Amino acid sequence: MALTDPYRTPLTLQQAAHLLRRATFGPSPAQIKQFAGQTPQAAIQTLLATPATPAPPVDPTTTKPFDTLAFDTTLQGTWQNATKYWWLGLMINAGASLREKMVLFWQNHFVSTAAVVADARYIYRQNTVLRRHALGNFRSFVIEMTKDPAMLRYLNGNQNVVGKPNENYGRELQELFTIGVGNYTEDDVKAAARVLTGWTDTGYRSTTTVDITTTFKAAQHDTTDKVFSAAYKNTVIKGRTGSTAGDTELGELVDMILAQPEAARFMVRKLYRWFINADITAAIEANFIEPLAQVFRQGNYEIKPVVTALLTSQHFFDDALRGSIVKSPLELNIGTLRFFGITAPDAVPNPTGFTQLMAFVQARNVEQQLNIMDQPTVFGWRPYYDTGFYDLWINSTTLALRGSFTDQLTAGTVKFGTEKLALDPVAMAKQTTDPSDPVKLINEWAALFFATDLTQSQRDFLIDEVLIDGLPRYEWNLEWQTYTSDPTNKNKLMAVSMKLNTTLQYMFRLAEYQLC
């Protein structure tokens, strides 16, 4: 049976949780149970459904969108934060959808940072491009990102003119965005830069309400022929003149790159590391990467069929791969909120609550070394580009901060607006088949919380030393029955709630909770 063959067996609870952990920022128990029993083919159709186009981010003071307003230096920091909070809110509220996980993949692939671009309206506009193309055609995606105003700013494409070519984008287009190191030469970088001369952005930090868009200036374009190396079979892109020269030559450049078999392999490897595992062995390369790269090439570089094949494959559902990825700060922090059904308020009727909650989440992400829309380099976040180093998310500092985040949730000390960010352990216990039975309670919680199985000694410790703190196990049964016989009694509710809360806090601190 080939690794890429479709897995057609209805999903178990653990398999459904595995799919949802990898394809979203984390499932709720209800979503796990909803997907259990479905075939992967049915499940992926739900995940691939196109969500409604989100409303743009708003200024927290006026609650009005700012993407079409004139630039305002005094509000730039506020708008930058509002754009980040807007996207975090979409991640939290996304439901069982692949979209936001794919948008993050592409934002970390086609890196343009808010700090460098320094115009929140540009970064928001780019995010709309990322989500529009997230599961579309890769060729069209590369072409549009090449001309994207934020990208032109970030990699200096707007400074690339005839006679004074800027090679930044021509290099990253090949090294990071399409084909990878070792598959082009320095002369190819120079030739690509000449192809790309003449593009510039309009509307940057404009104090009038002009459109943010891209313009091709024919007079700044290199009209001579561009000769590429043997890596590209000595292709010549003929120099053009006139208003269509930029688009024509850009299309030929992208076609030349994508005609190389390595381009499809390069992208499938990145998708593999994002969704499955960082370790690509020779066997995986031959039996998984190469077949899916052929699907990508033969499908004219359509993204959706490749992602579908990957997420429904026999290999994806290999039990050995569950828990093989360390959660990013987003997967940990947002995933925990999503698991407990905590949603982001609407920023328009409740700007204070929305801003306070998103600021809290963003601060936790940043201190755990993931600043959304602001990667440290053009390579993206190191755990994704430094092959095999997902564990870079965790060190002695960030591990303590991860634990602090979940401790704050169980303590219920974080407020946003008029609400408190708190988990409800009693409600979570009631979702198990028999919360009065400590064995069933811990077993079912563990199955929902963790990507890998706990040992029996771990389960026993959670029951005997954490939940009931050294008492006989029947004591928990009695305490739960006492509570349910008088559920409005605050003292009885507090008694079980405190024990469940302590158990949650301990489970969050287990190494297994850091894995997905």
What spans do the regions from the language model cover?
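Flexible, low-complexity segments enriched for small/polar residues
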Residues: 3-27, 260, 264-299, 308-516
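Residues that form generic nucleotide/phosphate-binding pockets
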Residues: 19, 34-35, 43-50, 91, ...
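Active-site substrate-binding loop specific to GH73 endo-beta-N-acetylglucosaminidase modules
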Residues: 2, 66-68, 80-87, 119-353
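N-terminal accessory alpha/beta regions
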Residues: 15, 27-133, 206-207, 218, ...
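Short, compositionally biased low-complexity segments
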Residues: 13-22, 56-59, 75-78, 164-168, ...
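Cell-wall polysaccharide-cleaving catalytic domain and substrate-binding groove, primarily
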Residues: 2-56, 147-151, 159-160, 172-175, ...
